[in-house]
């Protein structure tokens, strides 16, 4: 396990760091390292020494060793938070000299949920562009874990420039219920990696249209919820196909690009890409984005994509305007649509129902919920490591 040291080389380039917090965040960082994402330094921090020892991140350290003795946060966000506060000075030293930091975590557990807001807070105090990319739990993980995740996300959004939330439950809609659990988590890691690669490649990799760090900072500093989508197209109409897939991503929360205050577009293709294709992508984005949105487009030349063309869209500032709410799901929308009359006092039970609405197609079944909790406990420990 290496000690952290400040690297002063390449002063002309933006220094980007990716920090995986907790088990889920650490696994995401390890996946990015294995995928060979360039232009960023990867760090994994955790309260669980055993999980950290197995992680392949080049830089890592134990959070809150005095509090947890390296045994983890026990799914308690308060312990995760205290662990991060214990090592606040160390986090500050680790982040000094950084231009942009990605913080990735699985929300709903102890370390990721509790420590990620503290890491973000430290980064913002150092005037670092801070983007969090986090996942929300599967329904099978239980309502308690989902409630913890939502509370953590609510706290985290106050400490970052942009927050991208990926609901794991959406994976079931895209991959199908027969998809293996390991494959589902791998796909979640792919989405997390795609967000980091989409932004870092635009800054670090050469292309027909180069974008500097100041351009990225302009877009990503539009505080609020962000969305990320990736699309791949092939054939003569590949540019339009890729762009439309990117803005209609099914792995994201039900939010509209129309509310975005800033849009960052990464177009990745081989050397045969044409200006006409770049224009086609731009036209598609213009049709979806707000007319006053700041749109920054960059290209990355990568022969590994073959004859395909890939478009990654990062839309920011979703929630910055008074008329825009934070990320919401379909069932919450239905409840809000009926709330047109004079508000009445609510009981605790009614307030809890509004904050955690049931799905539209069924009434919550207590026995079924208890069964889901039991199923989660039956998941092997090597899989549950992903969830902390």
Description of each model-found segment:
Residues 1-388:
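Tubulin/FtsZ superfamily GTPase core signature
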């Amino acid at each position: 396990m290496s000690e952290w040291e400040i690297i002063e080389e390449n002063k002309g380039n933006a220094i980007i760091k990716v920090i995986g917090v907790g088990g889920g965040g650490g696994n995401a960082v390890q996946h990015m390292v294995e995928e060979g994402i360039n232009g960023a330094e990867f760090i994994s921090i955790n309260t669980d020494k055993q999980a950290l020892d197995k992680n392949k991140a080049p830089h890592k350290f134990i959070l809150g060793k005095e509090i947890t003795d390296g045994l983890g946060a026990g799914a308690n966000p308060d312990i995760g938070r205290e662990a991060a506060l214990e090592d606040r000075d160390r986090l500050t030293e680790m982040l000094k000299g950084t231009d942009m930091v990605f913080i990735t975590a699985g929300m709903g557990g102890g370390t990721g949920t509790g420590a990620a807001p503290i890491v973000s807070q430290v980064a913002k105090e150092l005037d670092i562009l801070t983007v969090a990319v986090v996942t929300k739990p599967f329904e099978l993980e239980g309502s308690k874990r989902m409630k913890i995740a939502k509370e953590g996300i609510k706290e985290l959004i106050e400490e970052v420039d942009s927050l991208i939330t990926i609901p794991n439950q959406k994976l079931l809609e895209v991959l199908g219920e027969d998809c293996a659990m390991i494959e589902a988590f791998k796909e979640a890691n792919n989405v997390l990696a795609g967000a980091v690669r989409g932004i870092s490649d635009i800054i670090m990799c050469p292309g027909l249209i180069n974008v500097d760090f100041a351009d990225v900072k302009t877009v990503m500093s539009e505080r609020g919820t962000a969305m990320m989508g990736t699309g791949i197209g092939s054939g003569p109409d590949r540019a339009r196909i890729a762009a439309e897939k990117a803005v209609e991503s099914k792995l994201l929360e039900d939010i509209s690009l129309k509310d975005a205050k800033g849009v960052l577009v990464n177009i990745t293709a081989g050397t045969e890409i044409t200006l006409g294709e770049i224009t086609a992508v731009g036209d598609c984005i213009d049709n979806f984005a707000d007319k006053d949105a700041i749109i920054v487009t960059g290209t990355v030349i990568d022969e590994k994509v073959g004859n395909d063309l890939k478009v990654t869209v990062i839309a920011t500032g979703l929630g910055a305007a008074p008329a825009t709410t934070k990320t919401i799901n379909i069932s919450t929308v239905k409840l809000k649509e009926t709330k047109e009359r004079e508000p009445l006092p609510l009981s605790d039970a009614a307030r809890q129902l509004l904050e955690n609405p049931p799905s539209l197609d069924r009434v919550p079944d207590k026995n079924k919920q208890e069964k889901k909790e039991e199923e989660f406990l039956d998941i092997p420990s090597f899989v549950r490591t992903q969830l902390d």
